[in-house]
Amino acid sequence: MKMNKLVKSSVATSMALLLLSGTANAEGKITPVSVKKVDDKVTLYKTTATADSDKFKISQILTFNFIKDKSYDKDTLVLKATGNINSGFVKPNPNDYDFSKLYWGAKYNVSISSQSNDSVNVVDYAPKNQNEEFQVQNTLGYTFGGDISISNGLSGGLNGNTAFSETINYKQESYRTTLSRNTNYKNVGWGVEAHKIMNNGWGPYGRDSFHPTYGNELFLAGRQSSAYAGQNFIAQHQMPLLSRSNFNPEFLSVLSHRQDGAKKSKITVTYQREMDLYQIRWNGFYWAGANYKNFKTRTFKSTYEIDWENHKVKLLDTKETENNK
């Protein structure tokens, strides 16, 4: 296969953009509201909502914790977003001779957006900063009067005045968590992106790594290998779990509702995966790799109505969106 033909094919493919969207045929389930009276001031109301995209293999599990505090002039909602986002991994064809490719889960995005007026705002969230740890753990605590604290670990920072607590705990080997740039008082979002990936002791490599001769060696097994192209990738089990399997997100957001505002509001929760295209080719002398970022994007959104007065939620809509280069 000639190089110019390969380059033209790659360019033509990258220039083509296909955008497909529509309402998902997703099943949603909401549990009955459970009530827990902490004391004569604070009452907790809890319900869990699930929505799935079978097509994209994305599952949202949202836990809504309403906090009614007589010593505070606002309503508080602690929303925990968990579930599953499949990587979309597609392994290479082992019979490919001098050119082969695979698709891998390079980045996962989760966001929560308040669709209401100024009566409902995002006032806190976790994680709060960039995190490159193998395991991300945070604990949120709510104390009387609307005070919120977020600490590292699964129990640190709590005291006897804590009326409610919630934790997050997820793994991100070779990936890192960053806060979305458009995070503000109406939106909060996180990205969990491939960051430092080792290849048999070499590296670390990332999505943008580049060697002037061998290109991006992210998943390249050997520069001078005599194997077929489809067999010259590192073994699948050597790839980071998030690149080839699933990501199980756990994020927290805190929404505050002014009691003299509208009794109902809307929020939209978005789960997304970005798949990169990684390919290798033999040029007659050596193997070289190339990584094309965000080659396929799959997005699943759910919109809920929040009933602040009755501490209930209602699934209004779900939407699936595909974006292919």
Curated annotation (Swiss-Prot):
SUPFAM superfamilies reported in the protein's UniProt record: Leukocidin-like
User: GO: which molecular function terms?
Assistant: toxin activity
| Record-linked Pfam families | Leukocidin
Tree of life domain: Bacteria
This protein's record includes keyword Signal: yes
Q: Name one GO cellular component term.
A: extracellular region
* GO BP: cytolysis in another organism
Q: Where is the signal peptide?
A: 1-25
Alphabetized UniProt keyword annotations: Cytolysis, Hemolysis, Signal, Toxin, Virulence
The similarity comment for this entry is: Belongs to the aerolysin family.
Its assembly, as annotated, is:
Toxicity requires sequential binding and synergistic association of a class S and a class F component which form heterooligomeric complexes. HlgB (class F) associates with either hlgA thus forming an AB toxin or with hlgC thus forming a CB toxin. Interacts with host AMFR.
As for what it does, the entry says: Toxin that seems to act by forming pores in the membrane of the cell. Has a hemolytic and a leucotoxic activity. Promotes host AMFR-mediated inflammation by mediating 'Lys-27'-linked ubiquitination of TAB3, TAK1-TAB3 complex formation and phosphorylation of TAK1/MAP3K7. In turn, activates host NF-kappa-B signaling pathway.
Q: What name has this protein been given in UniProt?
A: Gamma-hemolysin component B
**Record lineage:** Bacteria, Bacillati, Bacillota, Bacilli, Bacillales
